[in-house]
Amino acid sequence: MTEILDGKAVAKTINEQTKARVAKQKRPVTLAVIYDPSNDGSQLYVGMKSRQAAKLGIVTRDIPISTDATTESVIQLVEELNDDESITGILVQSPLAKGIKERQIFSAVAPHKDADGLGATVQGMLFGDSLENYTVAATPQGVMTLLAQYNISLKGKNAVVVGRSQLFGRPMFALLTNADATVTLAHRYTEPTTLKALLKNADIVVVGVGIPNFIQGEDLKKGATVIDVGMNVVDGKATGDVNFSSAQGIAGYITPVPGGVGPMTIATLLENTVTLAEQHQ
C-alpha cells in the first residue's frame, strides 16, 4: 500500500513554529520579492507567498521589474536591497524576463539576505557541507524536512534526482549526498534506457523537470519513495511529473500534486526568512 506524504499537514506545523519565532523578533521581519509581473505563474506564486507571510506576521515587499529591465538594472536593485537595513531577506522569483541572466541576479544577493539560498556563495557552501550560517533553497530543503517528518531513512540508500536546475536539482543532489545517500543526478536529456535503469534501482526518486507524467509507475522500484516536485497544468488541473495513479501500489511513499511539495516550499522559504532575522538581529 502506498502512503501519501502530506505536505500540507507538515507545512502547517512549520508555519505555526515560524509564526511564534516571528513574534519574538524586536524588528519587523521583511521579505523583498523581485519578480516579473508579465509572468502569470510568478504573479500567482508571489501572491500565495505574500498571503501566507502575512498570516505569520512577515512583511513582504513585492517589487515588479519593468519590461525594459536589464541584468545590470536588476543587480542594482538587488544591491540597494542588500544595503537596506529594513530588509531581512531577498527572494528573486524565477523566471525573470527573457534576456536577464538569472544566475548573476541570484549571486548578487548578499549571502546573509539570501532567503532562497540560490546565490553562488550559499550553493558553494552547501556543496561543501558547510552551511552553518546560511539558508538552503526552499524546495529541496522542504523535501528534506518532509522526508525527516516521515522518518524515511536516507543513509546508504540509492537516490535519483531527475532535474538539474539551480533552484531544485543541484541543491537537492547536495542535500541528499550530505545525508549519506548514494545519489545520481539525471535530467530530461538523460538517455531513456539509462534513466529507466536508474529508476528501477532507486530507493528514493525526486523529480522536477516540468513535464507532465514524465515518470510512470512501471518505471519505479517496488516500495520506492517518490517525491514529485513538478507542477504542471493539464486540462485545467494541477499535474505532477509523476503519473500519480500508476504509481499507486508500487511506490512505498509518494507526494501528491497539489498538496505535497508546494506547501513545503512556501513554508520553508518563510522559515528561512525568520532564520535570517534571528542570525542578524
Swiss-Prot record:
Pathway: One-carbon metabolism; tetrahydrofolate interconversion
Pfam families referenced in this protein's UniProt entry, alphabetically: THF_DHG_CYH, THF_DHG_CYH_C
One MF annotation (Gene Ontology) recorded for this entry: methenyltetrahydrofolate cyclohydrolase activity
Record carries keyword Signal: no
Keyword set includes Mitochondrion: no
Gene Ontology cellular component list: cytosol
Keywords (A to Z) from UniProt: Amino-acid biosynthesis, Histidine biosynthesis, Hydrolase, Methionine biosynthesis, Multifunctional enzyme, NADP, One-carbon metabolism, Oxidoreductase, Purine biosynthesis
Documented EC number(s): 1.5.1.5, 3.5.4.9
Record-listed NADP(+) binding positions: 163-165
Record's catalysed reaction(s): (6R)-5,10-methylene-5,6,7,8-tetrahydrofolate + NADP(+) = (6R)-5,10-methenyltetrahydrofolate + NADPH; (6R)-5,10-methenyltetrahydrofolate + H2O = (6R)-10-formyltetrahydrofolate + H(+)
Biological process, per Gene Ontology: L-histidine biosynthetic process; methionine biosynthetic process; purine nucleotide biosynthetic process; tetrahydrofolate interconversion
Subunit (UniProt): Homodimer.
Main function: Catalyzes the oxidation of 5,10-methylenetetrahydrofolate to 5,10-methenyltetrahydrofolate and then the hydrolysis of 5,10-methenyltetrahydrofolate to 10-formyltetrahydrofolate.
Family stated for the protein in its record: Belongs to the tetrahydrofolate dehydrogenase/cyclohydrolase family.
The protein, known as: Bifunctional protein FolD
Source species: Leuconostoc mesenteroides subsp. mesenteroides (strain ATCC 8293 / DSM 20343 / BCRC 11652 / CCM 1803 / JCM 6124 / NCDO 523 / NBRC 100496 / NCIMB 8023 / NCTC 12954 / NRRL B-1118 / 37Y)
Name of the encoding gene: folD
